[in-house]
Amino acid sequence: MEVKDILKTVDHTLLATTATWPEIQTILDDAMAYETASACIPASYVKKAAEYVSGKLAICTVIGFPNGYSTTAAKVFECEDAIQNGADEIDMVINLTDVKNGDFDTVEEEIRQIKAKCQDHILKVIVETCQLTKEELIELCGVVTRSGADFIKTSTGFSTAGATFEDVEVMAKYVGEGVKIKAAGGISSLEDAETFIALGASRLGTSRIIKIVKNEAIKTDSY
């Protein structure tokens, strides 16, 4: 697989709590230069970033991030605000307390409400696979499919682990037609990126692939 084809799947990501505007600018510049799928950045930078790229790059942001246990009303507001500010794509975190209580109907209803606000904007649903049993992940594949979301996403990158090959294999087997897969967190090599794509992921959330391409790969515990 050619590097340019891998880059087309990448949501070039910077979600560090201390991210500065010059750092965000670098993410945006690199994403445009290497023609990634989007740049994924904190919501507080969306308006400025959208103005900066002026339609040359899709802007992705996160809501309910990273813990997911804010109320549905709060997430709906975050979604509306992000889109109003110029976000093209929304990555939302589900409420894992609902999952652990077995209340999958509430999870599905929340996703439906947010998808309704997204309208034609892309919605990706972060399920935080490292916190799930295999049975819970399988159930959530059905929930995300029924909710009308565009993607199911493995991880925030802020929990105990990121994407694994095994989890993406499960998603590819159980998610419904029309729902795509985003692998995120800990993707640190072109080889891993290519494997995730081969297993069924059509998006990759990472900050490292461009660094590798630029021969600037560094070892880090961040997203």
Swiss-Prot record:
Keywords: Cytoplasm, Lyase, Schiff base. It is an enzyme of class 4 (lyase). The keyword Mitochondrion does not apply. Its main location: cytoplasm. SMART domains: DeoC. One of its GO terms (molecular function) is deoxyribose-phosphate aldolase activity. Belongs to the DeoC/FbaB aldolase family. DeoC type 1 subfamily. This is Deoxyribose-phosphate aldolase. It comes from Streptococcus pyogenes serotype M12 (strain MGAS2096).
